[in-house]
Regions:
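Positively charged n-region of N-terminal signal peptides that target proteins for export
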Residues: 1-4
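Functional surface patches built around histidine and acidic residues
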Residues: 20-267
């Protein structure tokens, strides 16, 4: 009895080709198998992502061309750069590659390998792109996983941070605070000169100043959450600046938040 030989490899990072077409029948089959495993494990299903599929296609072509498994061939960018080049915003990414005679055999082998299984069942990932390229009756498979981020403008992100802050105050039976607008705070956020003592000197009436970075507006840092229970807090100002990750795709927003207590605020 002949046994199919399957080669697999995986890669994880916590950090211009034509657009990929709709998934082929084989790619759809593997996509469905992945989501079936996640559903059995009580996890969210992954969404198909054309950006990830585009990156996966480029790599599967190299797998087939070289008749070998690797996460980076000579002259090829690393995984996060390949995915970042598609303009996808994300904060974690991983990859499985496999060589197999058919989809089911490949999927079975991936699920038996701890590293590959961990990628397939990673609870933080929300998207996947798959590419399968056939050469000489062998399938060369790339699965690219990611936790993708919403595409906020700076204005949208700032408004969401403010809304989440005031929502947290309401949950503590506190009144929402007024928000003033000072373009200097955005400039400070974009400057990457994060010396808070220096900034406070140029902002009369400020009783507290925080500088931090976020990928999602709902993930307020603990130091900012402390102000949600401050009874004396009257106003605040927030400056937001998007710092793109360049080719790596790991984009984030820098935030400068100034707080004014009622007795100290000067109009």
């Amino acid at each position: 009895m002949n046994r199919a030989i399957v080669a697999i490899a995986c890669l994880v990072f916590l950090i211009a080709l034509p657009a990929h077409a709709a998934p082929s029948q084989r790619e759809q089959q593997l996509f469905d198998l992945v989501n079936h495993e996640r559903e059995k494990a009580g996890l969210n299903k992954l969404e198909w992502n054309d950006h990830l599929a585009e990156a996966a296609l480029a790599h599967s072509k190299l797998l087939a061309e070289n008749r070998d498994l690797s996460h980076q061939f000579s002259g090829e960018p690393i995984l996060q750069e390949r995915v970042g080049a598609t303009k996808l915003r994300f904060n974690s990414v991983a990859e499985n590659v496999a060589e197999s005679p058919d989809v089911v055999t490949a999927h079975t082998a991936l699920m038996k390998s701890p590293g590959h299984r961990a990628n397939i069942l990673h609870q933080d990932y929300n998207a996947i792109g798959i590419s399968i390229v056939e050469r000489d009756h062998t399938l060369f498979i790339t699965q690219d996983f990611a936790h993708t981020l919403a595409s906020y403008t700076e204005k949208q992100f700032r408004e969401s941070v403010i809304a989440n802050f005031n929502q947290a105050r309401r949950a503590r039976k506190m009144s929402p605070v007024d928000v003033i607008s000072d373009p200097h705070l955005r400039k400070a956020a974009c400057s990457q000169d994060m010396h808070t003592n220096k900034m406070i000197q140029n902002m009369p009436g400020v009783s507290g100043l925080l500088v931090f970075s976020l990928s999602e507006p709902g993930a307020l840092p603990d130091d900012m959450r402390k102000y949600t229970s401050d009874k004396t807090l009257q106003r605040m100002n927030i400056g937001v600046c998007l710092q793109t990750g360049g080719v790596t795709g790991f984009s984030k927003f820098w935030v400068v938040a100034a707080f004014y207590r009622s007795a100290e605020y000067n109009q």
